[in-house]
Each structure stands twice: as structure tokens, then as C-alpha cells.
Amino acid sequence: MAKAPVRARKRVRKQVSDGVAHIHASFNNTIVTITDRQGNALGWATAGGSGFRGSRKSTPFAAQVAAERCADAVKEYGIKNLEVMVKGPGPGRESTIRALNAAGFRITNITDVTPIPHNGCRPPKKRRV
């Protein structure tokens, strides 16, 4: 007896009005993740994954392109408002926020969540080049 062909159901995207953009800006790369309020990832993009390699990966323009790609990835969820959490000292901090604003999101809050030790571990020794 032959089985009936299994039809793939079209995946229904849940509609989210408010989201959180997590920006991790290191000296070498920028990672942009947009989540819902509970922290479930809806879409993400990186400067390295956007086609930039080597030292070009750590530029503000690469971070801007990553933010635009992440914004395109989550457009179908219907996000209108974004809360932005920025972590790290990298060059892509400001340009990422500008790109998200230009993509049509209304930025409600910008928070710096860079981890700062209360005199924790000893830092690595200084580089000698």
C-alpha cells in the first residue's frame, strides 16, 4: 500500500511588534542579533558573514551592512519598535544603531551592557609589536 505524499505546511511567522537588538561589537567583528522580548532569536547577521574578511571586517561600514542584513531578515515578523543593547568597545557600535534606525525601526531605548569587571581577572600583558 503506497503512502499518500506528505505536503510541507507553510511555516507561519509569528507577529512581534517589539524586539530587542543585541549588538556585540568587538575589535575584530560585529554581531547583530534581533530577538523578541523573551530573548528568542528572530534573525542575526555578522560583519564576517556579510562578505568582509580580515581587517575590513572590523570597520564601521561592515557593521552597518551586517545591521541592514539583520533588519531584512526580521522584516517578515512585523517588528516596529526596537530596544538596543550594545556590548563591547568595537568600531561598529554607532554605525549599527544608525543603520537599524534607517531600516525603519523606531528605537525606543539604547543600553550599554558592556561587561565591566569589579577588579576581577588579571588582564593579558601588553602587546609588543
From Swiss-Prot:
Tree of life domain: Bacteria
Record's GO cellular component terms: ribonucleoprotein complex; ribosome
Entry keyword Manganese: no
Biological processes, Gene Ontology terms: translation
Keywords tagged on the record: Ribonucleoprotein, Ribosomal protein, RNA-binding, rRNA-binding
One annotated GO molecular function: rRNA binding
InterPro entries: Ribosomal_uS11, Ribosomal_uS11_bac-type, Ribosomal_uS11_CS, Ribosomal_uS11_sf
PROSITE patterns reported in the protein's UniProt record: RIBOSOMAL_S11
Pfam family membership, one: Ribosomal_S11
UniProt keyword Ubl conjugation, yes or no: no
SUBUNIT field: Part of the 30S ribosomal subunit. Interacts with proteins S7 and S18. Binds to IF-3.
Stated role: Located on the platform of the 30S subunit, it bridges several disparate RNA helices of the 16S rRNA. Forms part of the Shine-Dalgarno cleft in the 70S ribosome.
PANTHER family for the chain: 40S RIBOSOMAL PROTEIN S14/30S RIBOSOMAL PROTEIN S11 (PTHR11759)
Family classification: Belongs to the universal ribosomal protein uS11 family.
Protein name, as recorded: Small ribosomal subunit protein uS11
Gene source species: Salmonella paratyphi B (strain ATCC BAA-1250 / SPB7)
